[in-house]
Amino acid sequence: MKDYKLKRQKNLDKYRRQYEERKEFHKLLKEYASDIIASENFRNTRNYIQHGSMPVYRHCMDVADQSIKISKLLRVNCNERELIRGALLHDYFLYDWHDKYRDNYQRLHGFYHPGIALRNAQKEYSLSDREKDIIKKRMWPLTIIPPACREAWIVTAADKYCSLLETLKLRRGSGKTRMEIAK
């Protein structure tokens, strides 16, 4: 009976911590990125699949969340605003990269989409140099030139972590395939 109560208390503590972390993350989103979250183009990223069945929207939110967790875990002194905004916009390419029939289809999406995401983000937002660095270089080593700031290194690590979980289907998206979303 004692073991059961102890286990139950540990689970409750874990869920409380997770709830507090989510609450803090949403507070940071509201404070630093409400314009991005409210934008129609960013909301439309729900219609594009990133890895497996994960929508780009959720992938970017997860990368932003993991970036904050990594920076706190490692006690890295960085600019949270730029970290969150760069993480949210890191895959702002605004097309279905799986669609072989779209205009300008490029098989080397991994090499080209950071530049496309940066161009799209610059059209809609006033970006700092760090935010630009995050968006453009977080695909390193594919992008050849490594990130120049802590924030970009953190988003690079968070993106690779989230992408791995999504690709191995350890973190699932909406469960919908690209074809179901297109309907």
At which residue positions do the language-model features occur?
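Metal-dependent phosphohydrolase cores
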Residues: 1-183
